[in-house]
Design a protein with these regions (language model features):
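Short, flexible, glycine/charge-rich loop motifs used to bind or transfer phosphoryl groups or to couple energy/partner
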Residues: 46, 96-97
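Extended, solvent-exposed segments with strong compositional bias
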Residues: 60-96
Length: 139
């Protein structure tokens, strides 16, 4: 019984420690189809820009509710401007080449900073190419 208590205590401690090392930051998407689609990152609000992004991926939700990467970049440091869809920033490497974005589909832009931080923004485009952020994509 004592061994079980010790094992559970150790597992809980490890879970708390792992949770303490991860955090989220803010991602913002803007633009429209046919024009630049930009992604910006902020530390804890929309006033302190985050520049230490290490990976960024745009994925689309498939018909079976899975996610498929549409574009992915890796590396980098000292991001000085927003990431533009399909344009690999200096110091980054393209892992998956960009594919065409289509109205009516659901997309997610996901970023990590290499220090345990991550962020995601879910978006789509209406028929005229305007970026939308509906409450639910399941309607």
């Amino acid at each position: 019984m004592l061994m079980r208590l010790v094992a559970v205590t150790l597992l809980l401690s490890a879970g708390i420690a792992a949770g303490a090392m991860s955090y989220s930051f803010v991602s913002k998407a803007s633009g429209r189809l046919g024009g630049p689609i930009r992604f910006e990152f902020f530390r804890d609000s929309t006033t302190r820009r985050k520049t230490d992004i290490k990976s960024f991926t745009v994925s689309t939700r498939t018909a079976d509710d899975r996610w498929k990467a549409m574009w992915s970049i890796l590396g980098g440091s000292g991001l000085t401007q927003p990431i533009q869809y399909g344009v690999t920033p200096p110091g980054f490497t393209t892992m998956i080449r960009p594919q065409k974005l289509i109205p009516g589909r659901v997309y997610a832009g996901s970023a990590t900073d290499g220090h345990g931080g991550s962020s995601s923004v879910t978006f789509g485009f209406d028929k005229d190419g305007t970026m939308i952020f509906p409450d639910s994509f399941d309607q």
